[in-house]
Every structure is written in C-alpha cells, then in structure tokens.
C-alpha cells in the first residue's frame, strides 16, 4: 500500500463511481484547501468562514514543536513526569489516540464523577496538568481545573508551576489564567474542536507526554497535496463518497480495528463524524465495533476496516473482505483504510467535510450541542437538580422512562430493557448505551454494545458520560430520530 490508501467494494464502490467524478468536476477538494466557505450552502457560510484553518495545520502548527519540547524539558528537570489532561471532546480524544499510538502514558480526565476525579488527584509532586478548553467555559473541565488547583495548594505546591492552559485567545479561561500567572498556549480560533487534533489542543499534551508530534505533522503534511487534488484517486473524495453517497444512504458507519497501528482511532473518528454530520434530521452514525463487525451490519451499514499500513489490497483498488468479520453478501458496503496517524487525521477531516456537502449540511456547527448546553445552564441557574421520579425500583436499581409512557407493565430491569429494545425500528433503528461510570474501572461494560448487537441485530453504540455529550450527543439530538437510549448512572 501507499502511505495513505482507501479501497472500496460493493455499495461503497458504487458510491465512489457515482459521486467522485462530480466532486472532481466541482473542484471540491481544492476549494476546501483554498478555504472556500461557500461549499456548504448560504446558510453555512458564516460558520464555515471561521472554521477552515485546519487545512493548513500541518505547516502552521510547526512552531509548537520547539516551544513544547522546551517546556517539556523544563518540567522534566523539575521532576514532573506524569501528565494529566483535563478536557472534553476534541480537547481530549485526539491526545488520547496520539499518545496511545505513540505508546506514551497520559492520564485523560474527561469525567465529572467525583470518585474518578478524586482518583486522579494522586502523585501531585510529579504531576503536570494540562487544562484544555476551546471555549474556556466548559463546565466539566472548569470543575477539574478547580479540583487540581485546590489539591496542589492543599499539598503546599504552586499550581501555576504545574499547570498548562490550552484555550482560544480571549476566552474566559485565557483571561483568567493569564491574570493568575499560569502558562497559557493559545490555539487557532478558526479551527473547530473536533478538527483540532493538529492544533495546540492535540499537540501540547501529547508532546508533554513524550509523543513525537513532529512526525505526526510530517505525515499529515505529506498527504495534504494528495487530499487537495481534484482527482479521481483522491482518497478523501473516495472515502466521503463511501460514507455519505450510498443509495439508499447506509447511515451506519461501522469502524473495525483490523490491525491498525493507530490505537483507539475509532473513538476520535466517532466524534468527528457524529458531531459533524448528525443534524437537520440526517447524518452518519459511527459505530465503533468491539471485535469483528456482526454479519447483520453488512446489510444496511458501511463497514470500514482500519488496517495496518503494510496490509495488501488488490491492484484494482478492491479489497479482500474475507477476514472483516461476519459474512458479507454481494450487496455489502465495505471500505479499507490504511495510513499513519497524521495522514489519517487529515484524511478523515477532509472526507467528513466533503460528506457534509453530499448530505447537504454544514459539517462545522453543532447546533444541538450548543442548545443543550444552554438548557443545562438554565436548569443549574434555576437550582433544579432533583431530576425525574423513577417509574419503579428493582432492588437497588431505579428505572426512569423518558419520552412517553412506553414502559407498560414492566416492573423489573430486565423487562424494562426488553420493552425498550422492542421500540427499535428493525430497518433503521440503533441503540445508544450511555454510562456515567468509571470508564477505566468499569471498562468491561463496553462489551454490552456487542451483546446488544447479537441480541437485536441492530447497531449499538457505547459512550461514557459526560464525554459522549461532546461527541455522539449531537447525533443523538440532531440526527435521524431512530434511536433508543439506555442510560446508566450512579
């Protein structure tokens, strides 16, 4: 394989044949990299005009390499060898996959659970904390920042010497942190959060943890011209067509780790795709598969195999699907993607932007996330926190039903789950499991998604709260109204 390759078969290949020539004719790729904000229609122009700087990040972010290397050396000399990242959504997902792929440790704190936060407040004498928030007002991140500041002070340690702030210039966090004497690194404000992997949000915590961010940028820059080319072979155009151009639309995109060296890549791609496309009643639902993709998903979804860069594909661009899991039919929609992490970040960002054009939506806003944040602030300001009374209690488990009187006669957890699953549309439906628990201590709970695949034959996603609110939450609220939702809290 070349440095970056996308191959397709079945319905995905048909979509490539149908849509790529038009995308080439319309010069979509080159216009994206020229920052043409008119590509997504008049209603999207204002937002798009201030969200396209991600296209040049492989070059414009290079100044961070030396700056962060010097900071890491300074912190290392002071004895700080543990990096904790406080952030949500795009501020945490990219550093997590960058560090996991590089094999360097970083503790990502993207939970508001008091026990999880408390457990992170350890080894303070050797800890540097990176606080990342684009808006500078993310509630979860602000609470984590305050917890660490207080913990450092209680231990007799200076927080300003041990905390690094990453935020947009002029944000509330930027202003407050500078006034208090903290180190501040500003990110490019004309890059959206989910497109920020190659900005300070992705690079600063990753480099402080020891990841080689120069190679990451090198790999991204090496494919930029390829992705900007108005050419049938452009892998981003091919991937976008496979994602958003099947007829009828296969709106479930199943991401299967099939040997890729990019560890945890699916979680980063999940946010990018769901938050970019899930709006106006349409969108692509990314499903991060646990193991091989269930056979039923070949019937109505597109399965993407994330493979190692040394994998082999047929010379005509079609892929070997014999080990993709399940049993592919002749009508299957299958894609194989390979390439180093930096290259794939640019690939998927470009493809998602193109997919937005094919779907007729803006890939750069998140209207339902913003409205949900506003509603939450109103509730907090009003002092409302008691929630809804449970429908019944089964042992120590309280069961609450939202969205109508659908529980019927159910009086047990098992019966309630059965009733919920009975609401699934057997053609278009999906299940979203959301758990406000410890994603490290309760990691095995993710396997429930695979169990629900097997039980219902329908796609099932799993998200840890509250981080899913900054990821798939936009799709849940703004995408097709075909989901049923199972939320687990303590």
Predicted regions and their residues:
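Low-complexity, highly charged intrinsically disordered N-terminal segments
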Residues: 2-83
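Conserved beta-strand elements of the Class I
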Residues: 82-86, 128, 164, 254, ...
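Glycine-rich, small/polar surface segments that engage phosphate groups of diverse ligands
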Residues: 82-106, 462, 468-470, 484-486
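Short beta->alpha connector loops at strand-helix junctions that form conserved
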Residues: 109-110, 132-133, 185-191, 335
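Active-site phosphate/pyrophosphate-binding segments
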Residues: 154-304, 317-319, 323, 338, ...
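Phosphate/diphosphate-binding loops
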Residues: 305-332
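Extended C-terminal subregions enriched in glycine
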Residues: 432-467, 472, 477, 482
């Amino acid at each position: 394989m070349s440095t970056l390759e996308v191959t397709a078969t079945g319905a995905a290949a048909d979509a490539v044949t149908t849509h790529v020539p038009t995308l080439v004719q319309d010069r979509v790729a080159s216009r994206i990299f020229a920052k043409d904000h008119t590509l997504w229609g008049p209603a999207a122009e204002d937002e798009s005009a201030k969200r396209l700087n991600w296209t040049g990040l492989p070059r414009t972010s290079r100044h961070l390499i030396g700056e962060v290397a010097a900071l890491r050396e300074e912190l290392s000399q002071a004895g700080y060898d543990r990096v904790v990242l406080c952030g949500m959504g795009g501020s945490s997902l990219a550093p997590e996959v960058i560090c996991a792929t590089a094999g360097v440790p970083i503790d990502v704190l993207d939970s508001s659970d008091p026990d999880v936060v408390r457990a992170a407040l350890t080894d303070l004498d050797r800890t540097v904390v990176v606080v990342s928030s684009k808006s500078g007002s993310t509630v979860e991140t602000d609470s984590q920042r305050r917890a660490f500041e207080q913990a450092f002070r209680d231990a007799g340690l200076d927080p300003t010497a041990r905390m690094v702030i990453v935020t947009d210039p002029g944000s509330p966090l930027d202003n407050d942190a500078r006034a208090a004497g903290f180190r501040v690194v500003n990110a490019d404000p004309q890059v959206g959060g989910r497109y920020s992997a190659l900005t300070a949000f992705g690079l600063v915590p990753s480099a402080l943890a020891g990841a080689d961010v120069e190679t990451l940028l090198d790999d991204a820059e090496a494919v930029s011209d390829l992705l900007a080319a108005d050419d049938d072979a452009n892998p981003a155009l091919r991937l976008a067509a496979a994602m958003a151009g099947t007829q009828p639309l296969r709106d479930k995109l199943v991401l299967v780790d099939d040997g890729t060296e990019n560890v945890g890549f699916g979680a980063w791609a999940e946010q990018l795709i769901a938050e970019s496309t899930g709006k106006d009643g349409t969108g692509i639902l990314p499903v991060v598969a646990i193991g091989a993709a269930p056979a039923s998903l070949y019937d109505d979804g597109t399965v993407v195999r994330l493979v190692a860069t040394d994998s082999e594909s047929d010379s005509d661009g079609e892929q070997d699907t014999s080990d993709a899991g399940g049993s592919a039919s002749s009508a299957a929609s299958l894609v194989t993607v390979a390439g180093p992490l930096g290259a794939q970040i640019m690939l998927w960002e470009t493809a998602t932007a193109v997919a937005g054009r094919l779907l007729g939506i803006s890939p750069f806003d998140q209207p339902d996330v913003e409205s949900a944040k506003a509603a939450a602030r109103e509730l907090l300001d009003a002092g409302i926190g008691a929630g809804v009374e449970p429908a019944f209690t089964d042992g120590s488990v309280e069961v609450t039903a939202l969205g109508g009187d659908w529980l019927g006669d159910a009086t047990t957890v098992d019966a309630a789950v059965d009733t919920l699953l009975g609401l699934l549309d057997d053609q278009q439906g999906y299940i979203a499991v959301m758990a406000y628990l410890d994603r490290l201590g309760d990691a095995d709970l993710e396997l429930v998604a695979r169990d629900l695949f097997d039980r219902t034959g329908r796609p099932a996603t799993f998200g840890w709260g509250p981080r899913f609110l900054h990821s798939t939450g936009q799709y849940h609220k703004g995408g097709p109204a075909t989901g049923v939702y199972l939320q687990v809290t303590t």
